[in-house]
Amino acid sequence: MKAKYLFHTLLASVMLAATIGLTTACTSNDDNPATPSGLSEAVIKEKIVGKWKAITQDGKERVTDKLYVMTFNADGTMTYSSSTFFQNLSKYTWRNKAPFTYSISGNVLTREGQEDGELRKAFYEVTDINYQEMQMVFTSYILDGQTFSRDMKIGYERVTADYSEDIIGLWEVTEMTGEETYNDDNARLAFLADGTYRYYRKDDTGDWQLVSTRDVEEYFVDGDWLATRWQETGGEMNYEWWDIDEIQDGQMKWSALREREDGTRFTTTFTWKKVSDIAFLIDEEHFPDAEFRNRLCENDYAKDGLVTVEELADVDIIQCANTEGREKIKSLKGIELFPELTTIWAPGNDITELDVTKNAKLQSIDVEDSKITSIDLTQNPNLSYLNLNGNRLTAIDLSNNPLLRELYVGNNKLTAIDVRNIKNLFSFSCYNNQLSELILPDSPKLYFLRIQDNQIKGAAMDALIASLPNKESKLYVIDSANSNEQNVITTAQVAAAKAKGWLAVDVATSQAYPGSDYEN
């Protein structure tokens, strides 16, 4: 009796356990249905988020040109990067983080999106996944309206590195190992932030020269995978692919698994050293004026369309004076990117504004005969030469420019100018403005002074003469040929100037001016 009881008790326990297990399984599958592979849909959805690179195909390592990178986001969006030749379509694809969407049902992953106006779909079965590796079977895809069946087992590794910013800069190859046909110790590559690059070779003298026969030079980095393409003028597009093994401490290592026509394989590796960072491009974004860009690119430091940090440190002069047959520059925007500038020489253009507040080392500015209406010089304390003759200035602040020796602001629309703090002033021209008074600095070095075609007279002329230093020189004070001349200097004031060593001169005749018999 006892044995029978024990048997029934055991049987009940087993049935209860089975019932509980069945209930648990059913409850679990309602929330997290089992997939044919034994994986749960929820687990796949959780673990697939991130960046994955295809590395094996049917158990064999994929050559580098067959790699691609997929990045899955938690919201069902994804990107797909590839640069692959499709034999059945006889064309390359160039996908730089192309946007797609994805969905997961059971263990079936569907990727879809529009490319070139066509719906693209691909279907995979996830057979295994963890946080480092994933296995999928690529079953079929729809491309250009055609359906293609596949039975391709693809292995993926999770990509944690992102070298898309680290690669930007100028790199020089230092070492190469692998196939002889890839041997190259004579190359520089400049990777730019806009997805283009520049290729350089050494000439016979050992100088680096830009290879300028290429119409296209593009690249992208997705994670640790680099794809490049280029096209020689009149030639076909070329493609190349690399795994970036590391970028660290100014050194970059690439590797690529290649396959020969006979099916044998080899690995090529390159080691690069970083020569310099890229400071900026000579492009429309940084330099909106096309002629200014052209003039910059005529200089050695910018002839390849970019400026490195190393080159930037040596740029202290920008010369772009207008010459016959050249377009006039309308804007010098971008000049603020040159912090080492000491000289800007750009007379004879149509410049309307000039921002030099970031060029604190400037010593000389010449933008004569342009269309500048205002200029901020408060951040340029080292200026010693300033030529703004022939512009449209109505005011100017020189309070932070005490080192000026030569100051030319003639032929503007100034109603006032204060130069009293400029103690080293040697040459000063402020002719053809609307000045009604002018007090000169206490500068014993002052030698050249042109003030004609203004409105200085009477007590203001007395004050001007009183501020003249005692030395022999010439005061260009009147232009008798100008019917609009409003300066007035009397014979008594001419005599007062002469007593200090200054000869009053009529600009029209270049002769001594005797003075007026009346003050107004």
Which residues does each PLM region occupy?
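Conserved hydrophobic position(s) of the canonical leucine-rich repeat
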Residues: 171, 315, 341, 351, ...
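N-terminal capping/linker segments that flank leucine-rich repeat
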Residues: 164, 254, 258-259, 266-345, ...
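Bacterial Sec-dependent N-terminal signal peptides
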Residues: 3-5, 18-49, 149-164, 272-284
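Consensus "Asn ladder" position of solenoid repeat domains
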Residues: 349, 370, 391, 412, ...
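N-terminal glycine/threonine-rich, aromatic-flanked beta-hairpin/loop signature
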Residues: 62-110, 114, 181-227, 231
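Conserved hydrophobic beta-strand positions in leucine-rich repeat
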Residues: 316-321, 344-346, 363-367, 384-388, ...
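Edge beta-strand at a domain terminus
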Residues: 138-172, 214-218, 222-223, 258-280
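Canonical leucine-rich repeat
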Residues: 332-335, 354, 375, 396, ...
